[in-house]
């Protein structure tokens, strides 16, 4: 067995809150370290916040994101951590996940499929990265791999599906499977909608089964920018089995969910699959090799404990109530309001609720 402890971090971020976002990222990394996790996935665009809208087109946003990345990088020594940020490359802005290995930037994976329906307008700000294309990103005299990449970290291969990438028919995970990927990280900013958790569970479970991998899904939490609610809900699966699930609609700003996965078990599962055909070109330019020594960990049996309301008869009503409560609470504190005024449709006096602050 080759056991690895992985972690999915759920964060309640705010657009352009450079200090607060960095503090929450560092807190998540520290919590994962305390749990002895080696591989940590944080949400999509967690450095800037997902809801920056047209501020993504400001060079200051790009520069501050890179500065924050450099400030966080030393805190990842002895770990493998993914962070989300916008990256400017060849005059195109890309929604990227940066993989940091033992305190050094290993490279960047750019999102291939942009969310452009419903409440999402990613094509307004970002460019989709084409499949099988790799390049070098040059920043401050240094060069970093970027594009449709995967990473070989001490013999364990790690790839990415960034949020929408996993929701499409031609999802990148199939190509990652042919590259013998062991762990797929999915940093997401997936807003709450009724029944959406079941869809997420399906693509996480099916991705881990069909691609012969362990799958780590990390999501945003809370009312990030005033219009969309994120429910959190980290998920970790391996070989088609769900082995860990985090709480949803939490009022905590940082949550870390961990699980121990066996990469040798998923490798042999894929080897037994007659339809699986590995890529055998004798060296794949998309794979970034970097040394890393995984610490020994003890096997831990999965013990998923869903909240009672998640398995009750009134899930939809519970979701609505919890989503509204979290959304209003976050709006109150992030806008620094003193309270809400609730007006009844009658001649009775209005009812005013105040915060303790």
Identify the residue ranges that each predicted region occupies.
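Enzyme catalytic cores with a strong preference for nitrogen-chemistry domains
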Residues: 1-357
């Amino acid at each position: 067995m080759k056991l690895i402890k992985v972690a999915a971090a759920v964060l309640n971020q705010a657009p352009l809150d450079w200090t607060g976002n960095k503090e929450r990222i560092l807190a998540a990394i520290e919590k994962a370290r305390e749990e002895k996790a080696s591989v940590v996935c944080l949400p999509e665009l967690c450095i800037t916040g997902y809801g920056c809208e047209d501020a993504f087109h400001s060079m200051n946003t790009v520069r501050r994101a890179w500065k924050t990345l450099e400030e966080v990088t030393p805190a990842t020594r002895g770990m493998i951590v993914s962070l989300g940020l916008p990256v400017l490359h060849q005059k195109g802005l890309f929604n990227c996940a940066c993989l940091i290995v033992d305190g050094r930037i290993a490279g960047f994976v750019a999102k291939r499929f942009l969310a452009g329906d419903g409440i999402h307008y990613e094509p307004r700000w970002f460019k989709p990265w084409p499949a099988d294309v790799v390049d070098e990103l040059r920043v401050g005299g240094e060069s970093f791999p970027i594009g449709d990449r995967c990473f070989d970290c001490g013999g364990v291969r790690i790839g990415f599906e960034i949020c929408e990438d996993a929701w499409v028919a031609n999802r990148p995970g199939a190509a990652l499977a042919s590259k013998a990927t062991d762990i797929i990280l999915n940093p997401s900013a997936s807003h709450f909608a009724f029944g959406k958790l079941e869809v997420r569970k399906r693509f996480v479970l099916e991705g881990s089964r069909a691609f012969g991998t362990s799958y780590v899904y990390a999501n945003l939490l809370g009312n990030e920018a005033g219009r969309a609610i994120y429910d959190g809900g980290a998920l970790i699966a391996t070989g088609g089995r769900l082995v860990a699930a985090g709480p949803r609609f939490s009022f905590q700003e940082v949550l870390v969910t961990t699980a121990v996965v066996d990469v040798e078990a998923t490798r042999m599962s894929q080897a037994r699959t007659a339809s699986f055909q590995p890529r055998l070109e004798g060296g794949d330019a998309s794979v970034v090799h970097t040394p890393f020594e995984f610490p020994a960990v003890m096997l831990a049996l999965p013990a998923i404990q869903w909240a009672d309301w998640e398995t009750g008869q009134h899930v939809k009503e519970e979701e609505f109530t919890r989503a509204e409560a979290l959304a209003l609470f976050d709006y109150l504190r992030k806008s620094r309001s003193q309270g809400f005024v609730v007006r009844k449709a009658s001649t009775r006096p209005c009812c005013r609720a105040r915060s303790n602050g």
